[in-house]
Each structure stands twice: as structure tokens, then as C-alpha cells.
Amino acid sequence: MNVKLPKITRRRSPEVLAPAGNLRVLKTAVDYGADAVYCGGAEFGMRAASKNFTLEDIEQGVRYAHAHNVRVYATVNIIPGNAEVAGMNAYLGALAEIGVDALIVTDIGILMAARQIAPHTELHISTQAGVMNYQAAAALYELGAKRVVLAREMSLPEIREMRAKIPGDLEIEAFVHGSMCMAFSGRCLISKYTTGRDANHGDCAQSCRWKYHVVEEKRPGEFFPVEVTDSGTYLFNSQDLNMLAHLDEVIAAGVTSLKIEGRAKGEYYVAALTNAYKTAVTTYLNGSENATDLARDDTFALPEWVLQEPYKVTHREYSTGFFYPEKTVGESITRGGYISDWLWLGTAVDYDTVTQRLTVLSRNKMVPGQQVEFLMPGTEPIPFQIPSAGIRDETGEMVNEINHPAHEFSFPCAQVIPPGAMLRGKAR
């Protein structure tokens, strides 16, 4: 392994923390504005479904991120058994040698081991630890924690109170977007019971999102009187969290890091949401004379295109989760499954300024006349219409449409489009 990489100096402004399930997604998150990225290795992280990193991948990711002044946090947040302790300790040492900026841990034993094995690496307490109060946060601080990732069940008033009662240099991280678990902070046995896949080892089958017909013991043969459709009920199915329009309140409550859930998600999902949340934070800071002023009275207004970004990725019905205590639990239960109104159609590979032709690597079918958008970092999406003529495949032959995934096509485009820009369009 190469020499330990230097860490990145932290920022004072709110941090946009993006997920990465593999090296390609990590680079996308960096390119689209993340201040920090969290990722997990092939072992000891809570997302077995994501294409996790090898140690070599993590090292490459740290190099790429640090070259762009972005921090990298490694998740080691499973709840380990005895047989995993020795391997875990060796893994902590390897991550420290690579130079990750922080370790995200749940288990108290891992926390104490990390203090000894990686004394110069920040320790962040995972949401799996279920930190719900200032006393628990302060105790973890005394044990060496630099940051606590709050349980998703905390409200804004509770976060404000915690911020006021914990040490000033103990940071608060909170999930602001993505999937929520119907169990407390992910402590669920449904997956283990129904499929044998252990959620506490990152292998949740999301059995809670299956369709169920619920029967109560004293009323055999009768559906439990909740909202039930012919296809069943999603009683256990949480809505997705979306706090984009309310980031000013989250920041004002004292949250240091704004976390996007989704280490099992792909490049397009991470690009769109990272870009949206980064734009929202920039809007917030530009509206304040002092970037550390957390008591702004002016109105936080985002451009409409930013507010629409969460609806252009695959999602479930959205809610504000538990941030507002006046909302009932039932308001966070979705009545259906995934919504996929927009598709990632392809990625820009090259633009020829002489011929004004754009080359794209396709992912989904595109046809002449189709209205699409280019998604690019730090800017509003650019509308575009697939031209009615002049489409060529990778052999240079003229074709009528783009209909082969993972193939390169080119077509006329007057707008200069940089490599890495993503094309998307409404599902047809």
C-alpha cells in the first residue's frame, strides 16, 4: 500500500455528504459538488447490496477526492460478532494507513479499538447507534467521537436542544434525503426472519416494502382496518425523506453535515441529488452575510428547477420524516412503490467544436424529436431536442434512432457540452 494520504482541512460551512457504492459513483459525487463522500469496503459496512470498495478502490477514491478538496469517510458500522473482531481491527489499520478522513462506527468496541489503531483519524458515530439525546452524544464525545450521525427519528426542536447542550466541537450529521427504515434506526429483524439476510450486517432485503395483507389475531380472516387496496397494503413501507426545501431550518438547528442516503444507488441518482443539495446550500450561504450565521430571518427560496430534481430520480413518495413533531407517523407511510418518471439516457463522452457534434454513451433508447435535458454540475439543466437527422453510430453509419445501450452515438449539437454531462428524459 502507498504512503498515507494527507487529510483535507474541514470547512466551516454546512457540508453536503454524498453516498458512493463504488469508485465510479464516488468520482461522480465529487464532480457534482459533494464536500464529502462516504463509502464502505467489501466487509464491515452496512450496505452489502452496493458494489463496495476494495482497499485499492478506497485508496484511489481518497486520492481523487483529496485532489478536489473533498473528504472521504469510511463506514465500518456493522454490529460485529466475536469472529469478526480480529479482521475488523486489521481493516481499521488499513483504512488509517490509506488516509481516510473519518471512520463511521456503531459498535462501542470498534470505537475504542479505532482510538488505539487510528489515533489521527476522526471517529463518527453511525446512525445505527441510535443517538437520540444530548447526554448520549456528550458521552460518545468523551469516548473520542468527533461527530454523531443522528437517529432519523429526531425532530428539529430536539436537534436544536442537543446542539445547545453538547460540546461546541462535537459535530452533528443528519440524513436529509433518501430511504427511511420502518424500524428504529435500522434495527430490524424482518429481513432476517423472511429471507435469512441480516440487516445488521448490511444485507437487508427490504422485506418491509413487500405487499402485505395484515390480519389481527382476534379477527381471523379479516383484513386489519388500514388503507388497503386490492393489491395489498404498504403498512410497513416508509416514504422517502426529502428536506431540500427546508435546508435552512436544518442548518439553523445546528446540523454540520447534510447526508444523502443511497450507497446502493447509481451515478445518475447521486449526481442529480448532490448537485441539487449543493446548489441549495450555496443559495443559503449566498443569502447570508455571514456563512456561520444560523439565525437568519430572511426567506429561503430555491429555484424551481432545484426543487424538481428529487422528482427526476427514482423515488418513493416524499415526506419530511420526523423533522416536524406535529406530523403523524402515518403521514410518513407510502401507499405505493417506486416512482420513475425520468430516465438516465446517456452520458456525454466528447464534443467536437469544429463539427459541433456531441458523442454520447447511451443507456436507454433515444429517438428523433425527443425532449431531453443535460445535467451538469453547478448549473440549471439545459433542455435539448434529439435532432431529426444526422445521428451516427460508433462506426460512422447514419441511424434513425439511438437504441443500443452501452454504445456510442453522435449527433449535431450547437451547445458545447462537457464530457460527463448526463442526458435524461421523461419515461416514455
Locations of regions flagged by a protein language model:
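Surface-exposed amphipathic alpha-helical tracts and adjacent flexible/coil segments at the periphery
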Residues: 1-32, 36-39, 43, 61, ...
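Glycine-rich, positively charged N-terminal anion/phosphate-binding segment
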Residues: 47-66
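Glycine-rich loop at the start of a catalytic domain that most often binds anionic cofactors/ligands
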Residues: 50-55, 86-92
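Gly/Gly-Pro- and Ser/Thr-rich, intrinsically disordered tail segments characteristic of DNA damage-repair
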Residues: 86, 123-132
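Alpha-helix capping/helix-boundary segments
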Residues: 109-110
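Conserved phosphotransfer cores of two-component systems
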Residues: 118
